[in-house]
Amino acid sequence: MKVLIFDTETTGLPDGKNPSIYDTQKWPHIIQLSYIIYDSETNDIVTLEDDYISIEDDVIIQPESQKVHNISRELLSSKGIPIEHALEKFNRFSDMSDVL
């Protein structure tokens, strides 16, 4: 069985305790999407991906979050890819997986 395990880093925390999922301005931006696909039958790692996501100049990375993940705007400028590309790639790998 192929298992996809993923993790994200963001620009901060949501604005407010329980903001609506439709109020996107209150949610942080994803700035890193990392995942592995593990084959439990062969005990092999099928793939290991680590994508930094580029963000617009007006998006603020909260200092508290940057202390946790150590992702700077400079790093995103040099290594970041558009979120659409990262999500398309993630979607392709999720199609290869039996479990998320």
What are these regions (language model features)?
Residues 2-100:
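Conserved non-catalytic scaffold segment of RNase H-like nuclease domains
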